[in-house]
Curated annotation (Swiss-Prot):
Coiled coil: none annotated. It is found in: Golgi apparatus, trans-Golgi network. GO terms for biological process: endocytic recycling; positive regulation of endocytic recycling; positive regulation of retrograde transport, endosome to Golgi; protein ubiquitination; regulation of insulin secretion. Keywords: Acetylation, Golgi apparatus, Phosphoprotein, Repeat, WD repeat. Acts as a component of endosomal retrieval machinery that is involved in protein transport from early endosomes to either recycling endosomes or the trans-Golgi network. Mediates the recruitment of Golgi-associated retrograde protein (GARP) complex to the trans-Golgi network and controls early endosome-to-Golgi transport of internalized protein. Promotes the recycling of internalized transferrin receptor (TFRC) to the plasma membrane through interaction with endosome-associated recycling protein (EARP) complex. Residues 322-335 have a biased composition (Basic and acidic residues). This is EARP and GARP complex-interacting protein 1. Transmembrane segments: none annotated. It comes from the Eukaryota. GO terms for cellular component: trans-Golgi network.
Amino acid sequence: MEDDAPVIYGLEFQARALTPQTAETDAIRFLVGTQSLKYDNQIHIIDFDDENNIINKNVLLHQAGEIWHISASPADRGVLTTCYNRTSDSKVLTCAAVWRMPKELESGSHESPDDSSSTAQTLELLCHLDNTAHGNMACVVWEPMGDGKKIISLADNHILLWDLQESSSQAVLASSASLEGKGQLKFTSGRWSPHHNCTQVATANDTTLRGWDTRSMSQIYCIENAHGQLVRDLDFNPNKQYYLASCGDDCKVKFWDTRNVTEPVKTLEEHSHWVWNVRYNHSHDQLVLTGSSDSRVILSNMVSISSEPFGHLVDDDDISDQEDHRSEEKSKEPLQDNVIATYEEHEDSVYAVDWSSADPWLFASLSYDGRLVINRVPRALKYHILL
């Protein structure tokens, strides 16, 4: 059973920002933002044609500045946010804005893979997230499964909840909270939990993870020294409401139960340099992706702490007598956690990995040299999980 070869797409600029087009659940589509100091920056809309194993692309100009973070609306295929650098009075500021792509590009491209002659189109600015009083924006996260009207941005030591009004053309600051403590505290990343009616957000600053209640903007849990060095990223298990994963500069990936934060439930130490990204699969939470500046992407099978630790359990009525004994044996033993695959198509630091929002078995990774790689979960594992 041969696996499909990875598909590689090269951007002409350096890049570190990647997101699936979250509201698109039929076509496999990713958005990539570039980081160029000399030229106009771009957002590449990457369409993956699964049947022919080829990539089609469209390019949008992002003239506001180099893109550090990109995030797509869960409700509107055409709307996205970016965090970008701009210079003002010889200072560099990281700002955030909400944009709309041209209507005809929302549902993908029919451009041939090698057609680079077409002119790039520009994004329509819907609104800025005003950060004059709050500092540099680290990231923007959308309310999961929401109507695309609520976002949270992290700016220096502030967590800001925004209401998007008038078709996203106006961002109103609904509430905010600040990190208090010694030194210059700064958020590095955050995720919005899909559980608890979307009332919880987790953030990382320095080596600490914190949970926040978005209704009162108060802290609900705190994991100090979650990592030995800076925490780079975190993600919530989509199927287990108290579980989250974190990764950092100590080369580790840790899994936490927020009801008992004294120590991690599990720790992975497979990378040899900083781990920049951790992502749970949206459907099968045992599948966890990580990307690191050791230039590798690792797919792990964390089945023992997943929502199906005994594998796919079959209903008793569905089992014939001959199968009965075999399946009983199988279901008694929890399956073992392991590294499924290490992907080594990158030659530079991998700053972003993410799953497709349309195909649960497909993911993309992006390295700083502008190389985007599309890979799939190995077929043998896919069928093992499904059957």
